[in-house]
């Protein structure tokens, strides 16, 4: 299993950002926001070029989560698969989806946010960060979450 937490930290430190769109740009991954119906986002590779598509009908916080999730696929699974899509029911379906979601949570929610608020519930962290509770379940900080 890929260490998604370490991968997210290395990229964030290397490029001095945790913004998934900025990171995608640094990594040569093309991003596009547009209507995708019921699909939240997808990542695909065509002739060695990586593309991330994000549903424009989602709120900005969810778009950022989707961008980070799909970037996780682009950087961690480029040799395993060539197409991933994220739909609301796809969070726990296989190793690659779990790794991509873990990467996204680790990228977008720094450990310091959790450590500075000991005892916060997932609900409270959700209100603080603006990210959904089911997303925050993938964040791991020394046994706190």
Where are the regions that the model predicts?
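Active-site hotspot residues in diverse enzymes, especially metal/ion-binding acidic/histidine motifs
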Residues: 1-145
